[in-house]
């Protein structure tokens, strides 16, 4: 036991003695503790004493337990018992039947196929079951290959079942679609495939919650990084993918509408034109990003990464959203070297990424050059890429752009490329010694115009009739290949019909996909390049009519919801509309005559007032009635005009007809304020003005 308050101090004669500073002990007793201090045991010392003394039973003289120790059971408590059998004690805590699991798997697949549904919480869901195949299905091996023919003495050697035929056509097709390349490839064609750039890409993918894939509207499928999209869907399924169709001002509006409709089945797609002063799609993209930030309300901010091919306009889109130059921009590829963080709003950050090029066996050196991956000035022989360019561009556009003479059938092959480059070099004055045309310099000029959009070109949307030479289809020169292509036309039609059916079926299952609250008037896009009549046409088909009907239905639904909420507001709005419809709107000519008559009456009244200035008598009743009527008419007209002027609805106008873009409208003289008269009309100048002052 510890020492209490009243223990014997005589047993310890040195108790209470304190050493002095010199080290000698004095006989005087001094108090160790300050008066008022608690000298009882604290909690720590009390628990230690309890640990030492506890754990033992209290017994009497005979050894019988009087008080049991802690955690000690008596004989009565230790009687044998029996637990009632129940599955809840011995079964699994989380179980699911196979039918429920199959239902979950099918529902999960349908939701995964829908790019417009977002899974907010996934911590307690068995997401691995969605990727597994159904284990109930047994492999039908015995039906395809019997056991006796596979194993045993009657086993047969397996050979591929091929149709017997000649391999000439197959070899020609292989040369067309997969041309042989030299083993030693120039390093300039490997731009965008280095480990450093792909390291920057994976930094952006890991850091971003929303990934925006920027596509070129002239060739969306050609500028899509398919391996990156598949990687995001398999490994990063929780990240959102959005397609942005940039450079829509370089293609007709019907092409943009088709591509948006086609790409919207796989991911939300937005048409965009990057320009700080005159952009298209900026509000729609910001609205979409705000919706994603609302979905991730548990996070302080979200990051949006921009990926895509070089020279597709990733940095230009960021500058457009910020409305100022925050990223370096150039019309040549490879300007962005490293990733860059930009703050768009308090909760939305943007990440700029350098352009990447996926390694694909189908892309040749010419394809990489025509996609704008390589800088043209660094090419050693740019003239070798011109024949492929001539196959993709209509001859009329080259004639119009460079002022060439018309040739029936256009130019094909190396001979046509030589003729075109020679004519362009002579016209532009690019000559070598002796007056020979510099074809390489002319080829660089044509390729630069091609990349910057001065030469009109676009790839026709899939599953639709192609527009002549604009479609990205390689035309053959030999007769054998032409015959082979004619045979394949029927197969291509069948595949197109199959694709159309798949697209329609997918559209029926998923519905017409569009993000609610994000609408784009694609018909109002101002195209910079002028296309010919058959290229600038716009198809009106059943599908587009269905889209318009769906838009009307969505608008009607929104109106119904608004009606339920604000009935009084709409009634007042209807009254305002009825008031706005005035006599001037219905009969403008008669209204003009009435206004003129009113003006004459007002002038007469003014003259009468000027004549009667000296006589300040009360005017007659007729004059009062006239003035009141005129004043009331003027008040009504001013009220109507005020309503029209204060409305926030602006009429659509073309930006390039009003603004002085590149000094095109510098000769046009428009006064700053036509309503006001000039200073010379109001005040006299010269000596007369000085005299009056």
UniProtKB/Swiss-Prot annotation:
Biased composition (Basic and acidic residues): 480-500
Binding site for GTP: 308-315, 352-356
Signal peptide residues on this chain, from the entry's feature table: none
Record-level GO cellular component terms: nucleolus
UniProt feature, compositional bias: Acidic residues: 541-588, 597-618
Pfam family, one: MMR_HSR1
Biased composition (Polar residues): 647-660
Residue stretches making up the CP-type G domain: 198-359
Compositional bias annotation for Basic residues: 661-677
Annotated segments matching region Disordered: 1-27, 144-164, 461-500, 541-693
CDD domains tied to this protein: NGP_1 (cd01858)
Record's keyword terms, sorted: GTP-binding, Nucleotide-binding, Nucleus, Ribosome biogenesis
Compartment(s) where it occurs, according to its Swiss-Prot or TrEMBL record: Nucleus, Nucleolus
UniProt record, GO biological process: ribosome biogenesis
InterPro entries given in the database record: G_CP_dom (IPR030378), GNL2_CP_dom (IPR024929), GTP-bd (IPR006073), GTP-bd_ortho_bundle_sf (IPR023179), NOG2_N_dom (IPR012971), P-loop_NTPase (IPR027417), TRAFAC_YlqF/YawG_RiboMat (IPR050755)
Entry superkingdom: Eukaryota
Coiled-coil spans in chain: none
Gene Ontology MF terms: GTP binding
Job description of the protein: GTPase that associates with pre-60S ribosomal subunits in the nucleolus and is required for their nuclear export and maturation.
Similarity-based family: Belongs to the TRAFAC class YlqF/YawG GTPase family. NOG2 subfamily.
Other information: The C.neoformans mating-type locus is unique, spans >100 kb, and contains more than 20 genes. MAT-encoded products include homologs of regulators of sexual development in other fungi, pheromone and pheromone receptors, divergent components of a MAP kinase cascade, and other proteins with no obvious function in mating.
The protein's name in its UniProt record: Nucleolar GTP-binding protein 2
Organism for this UniProt entry: Cryptococcus neoformans var. grubii (Filobasidiella neoformans var. grubii)
């Amino acid at each position: 036991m510890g020492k209490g308050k009243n223990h014997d101090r005589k047993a310890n004669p040195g108790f209470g003695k304190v050493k002095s500073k010199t080290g000698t002990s004095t006989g005087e007793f001094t108090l160790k503790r300050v008066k008022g201090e608690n000298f009882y045991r604290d909690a720590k010392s009390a628990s230690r004493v309890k640990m030492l003394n506890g754990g033992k039973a209290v017994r009497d003289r005979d050894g019988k337990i009087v008080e049991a120790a802690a955690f000690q059971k008596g004989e009565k408590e230790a009687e044998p018992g029996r637990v009632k059998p129940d599955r809840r004690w011995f079964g699994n805590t989380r179980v699911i039947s196979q039918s429920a699991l199959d239902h979950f798997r099918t529902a999960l697949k349908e939701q995964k196929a829908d790019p417009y549904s977002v899974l907010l919480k996934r911590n307690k869901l068995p997401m691995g079951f969605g990727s597994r195949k159904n284990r109930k299905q047994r492999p039908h091996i015995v039906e395809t290959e019997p056991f006796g023919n596979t194993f045993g003495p009657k086993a047969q050697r397996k050979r591929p079942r091929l149709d017997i035929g000649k391999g000439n056509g197959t070899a020609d097709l292989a040369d067309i679609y997969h041309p042989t390349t030299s083993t030693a490839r120039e390093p300039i064609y490997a731009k965008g495939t280095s480990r450093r750039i792909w390291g920057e890409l994976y930094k952006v993918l890991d850091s971003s919650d929303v990934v925006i894939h920027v596509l070129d509207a002239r060739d969306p499928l050609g500028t899509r990084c398919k391996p990156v999209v598949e990687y995001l869907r398999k490994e990063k399924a929780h990240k959102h993918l959005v397609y942005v169709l940039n450079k829509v001002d370089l293609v007709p509006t019907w092409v943009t509408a088709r591509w948006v409709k086609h790409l919207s089945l796989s991911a939300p797609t937005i048409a965009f034109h990057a320009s700080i002063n005159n952009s298209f799609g900026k509000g729609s993209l910001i609205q979409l990003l705000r919706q994603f930030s609302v979905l991730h309300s548990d996070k302080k901010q979200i990051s949006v990464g921009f990926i895509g091919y070089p020279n597709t306009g990733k940095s230009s889109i960021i500058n457009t959203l910020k409305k100022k130059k925050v990223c370096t921009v150039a019309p040549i590829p490879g300007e962005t070297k490293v990733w860059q963080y930009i703050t768009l709003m308090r909760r939305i950050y943007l990440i700029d990424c350098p352009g990447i090029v996926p390694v694909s066996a189908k892309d040749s050196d010419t394809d990489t050059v025509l996609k704008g991956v390589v800088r043209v000035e660094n090419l050693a022989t740019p003239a070798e890429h011109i024949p492929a360019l001539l196959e993709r561009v209509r001859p009329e556009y080259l004639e119009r752009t460079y002022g060439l003479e018309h040739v029936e059938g256009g130019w094909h092959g190396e001979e046509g490329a030589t003729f075109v480059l020679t004519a362009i070099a002579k016209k532009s004055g690019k000559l070598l010694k002796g007056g020979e045309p510099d074809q390489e310099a002319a080829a660089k000029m044509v390729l630069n115009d091609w990349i910057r959009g001065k030469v009109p070109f676009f790839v026709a949307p899939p599953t639709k009739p192609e527009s002549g030479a604009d479609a990205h289809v390689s035309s053959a020169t030999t007769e054998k290949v032409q015959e082979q292509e004619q045979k394949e036309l029927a197969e291509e039609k069948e595949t197109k019909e199959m694709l159309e059916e798949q697209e329609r079926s997918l559209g029926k299952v998923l519905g017409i996909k569009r993000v609610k609250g994000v609408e784009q008037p694609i018909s109002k896009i101002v195209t910079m390049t002028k296309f010919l009549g058959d290229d600038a046409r716009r198809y009106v088909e059943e599908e587009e009519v269905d889209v318009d009907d769906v838009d009307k239905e969505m608008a009607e639904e929104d109106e119904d919801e608004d009606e339920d909420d604000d009935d009084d507001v709409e009634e007042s709005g209807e009254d305002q509309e009825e008031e706005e419809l005035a006599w001037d709107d219905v009969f403008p000519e008669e209204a003009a005559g009435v206004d003129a008559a009113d003006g004459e009456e007002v002038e007469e009244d003014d003259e009468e007032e000027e004549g009667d200035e000296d006589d300040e008598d009360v005017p007659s009743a007729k004059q009062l009635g006239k003035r009141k009527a005129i004043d009331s008419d003027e008040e009504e007209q001013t009220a109507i005009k005020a309503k029209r002027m204060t409305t926030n609805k602006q009429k659509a106008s073309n930006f390039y007809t009003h603004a002085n873009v590149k000094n095109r409208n510098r000769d046009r003289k428009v006064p700053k304020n036509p309503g006001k008269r000039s200073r010379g009309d109001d005040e006299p100048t010269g000596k007369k003005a000085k005299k009056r002052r």
